[in-house]
Curated annotation (Swiss-Prot):
CDD domains: EF_Tu, EFTU_II, EFTU_III. This is Elongation factor Tu 1. It is found in: Cytoplasm. One of its GO terms (cellular component) is cytosol. Keywords: Cytoplasm, Elongation factor, GTP-binding, Hydrolase, Magnesium, Metal-binding, Nucleotide-binding, Protein biosynthesis. The gene is tuf1. Mg(2+) binds at residue 26. GTP binds at residues 19-26, 81-85, 136-139.
Length: 394
């Protein structure tokens, strides 16, 4: 079968494998690329190519991640796989690899294990919207009742963390046998690919979401008014549209009277573009870096939220010592630092470098935020942690 050229017209979906160590995540990743390449064209990736994950940096944190790509007839997938548990924690919290859906790998020989639970919880906290289960190593279990029991346990665990356990697709397979070319088990990989296509909806593109621009700079242009600059995070801003200025101070309304890029006037600015937006009736001192421009009514300012955070280890350039309750670092959202206080979970006295922990944060100024927003934790400009807003509280 001839290799087809990369079709940009196909919807692009980001997925990844999660689950307990040695349950077969990397073997499954290799099996998916191999079976889909054989069936639909594309490149197969061997286990050792994937397992030898390169180091990358995301927000100053070292993460080992493998990226593979594969196609089904209707979609193009980018898939991440991490070698170690710590890499998953970092990856999910920093959003280095945002997932539109995840494949939870559970070995039928073991059933759910501690990291199975932790990855499901992390998925819930960081906003992984869909999980599909691949029950691996089913070739090693002869007992149908045992398989049903494991399946039931996995469904209960998913439901416990607010995923729809009863309706989650579960595929019974053997990644190793599929990788070895056994047709019976290859069919299970195609079944899994079918669920990726049908169960994970097409992700909404940034440009189709409501307009938001984090303000990086503010200028006053004599005779024209106040211009804010920044990169449009999502949506489109057109000349003549109303906007809200959200965060830090009271929310204000204004109208966009001009959009410019590279000193050229445009009639709109789109997601991903660096633009200047001219605002009607706003004085230079009424607006500042760290606020956002947004479509009215689409985002609110908040000071209190529950978060999932990863604290950098000493080797990553993080703290050398633990911190305790009463810790007051800066929280860096989009373009600015805001000081905040923390509440640790019950029974947790201190947090060590290299830990991941759930904490409630209260900021001294409100920031425009939604669940899923990423942030860095800093001390005097140095990054000591990374986090994600799990739930806005007030």
């Amino acid at each position: 079968m001839s290799k087809e050229k990369f079709e940009r017209t196909k919807p692009h979906v980001n997925v990844g494998t999660i689950g307990h160590v040695d349950h077969g995540k990397t073997t499954l990743t290799a099996a998916i690329t191999t079976v889909l390449a054989k069936t639909y064209g594309g490149a197969a990736r061997a286990f050792d190519q994937i397992d030898n994950a390169p180091e990358e940096k995301a927000r100053g944190i070292t993460i080992n991640t493998s990226h593979v790509e594969y196609d089904t007839p209707t979609r193009h997938y980018a898939h991440v796989d991490c070698p170690g548990h710590a890499d998953y924690v970092k990856n999910m919290i920093t959003g280095a690899a945002q997932m539109d859906g995840a494949i939870l790998v559970v070995a039928a020989t073991d059933g759910p294990m501690p990291q199975t639970r932790e990855h499901i919880l992390l998925g819930r906290q960081v906003g992984v919207p869909y999980i599909i289960v691949f029950l691996n190593k089913c070739d090693m279990v002869d007992d149908e009742e045992l398989l049903e029991l494991v399946e039931m346990e996995v469904r209960e665990l998913l439901s416990q963390y607010d995923f729809p356990g009863d309706d989650t697709p579960i595929v019974r397979g053997s990644a190793l046998k599929a990788l070895e070319g056994d047709a019976e088990w290859e069919a299970k990989i195609l079944e899994l690919a079918g669920f990726l296509d049908s169960y994970i909806p097409e992700p909404e593109r940034a440009i189709d979401k409501p307009f938001l621009l984090p303000i990086e700079d503010v200028f006053s242009i004599s005779g024209r008014g106040t211009v804010v600059t920044g990169r449009v995070e999502r949506g489109i801003i057109k000349v003549g549209e109303e906007v809200e200025i959200v965060g830090i101070k009271e929310t204000q309304k204004s109208t966009c009277t001009g959009v410019e890029m590279f000193r050229k006037l445009l009639d709109e600015g789109r997601a991903g573009e660096n633009v200047g937006v001219l605002l009607r009736g706003i004085k230079r001192e009424e607006i500042e870096r760290g606020q956002v421009l947004a479509k009215p009514g689409t985002i609110k300012p908040h000071t209190k939220f529950e978060s999932e955070v990863y604290i950098l280890s000493k080797d990553e350039g993080g703290r050398h010592t633990p911190f305790f309750k009463g810790y007051r670092p800066q929280f860096y959202f989009r373009t600015t630092d805001v000081t905040g206080t923390i509440e640790l979970p019950e029974g947790v006295q201190m947090v060590m470098p290299g830990d991941n922990i759930k904490m409630v944060v209260t900021l001294i100024h409100p920031i425009a935020m939604d669940d899923g927003l990423r942030f860095a934790i800093r001390e005097g400009g140095r990054t000591v942690g990374a986090g994600v807003v799990a739930k806005v509280l007030g």
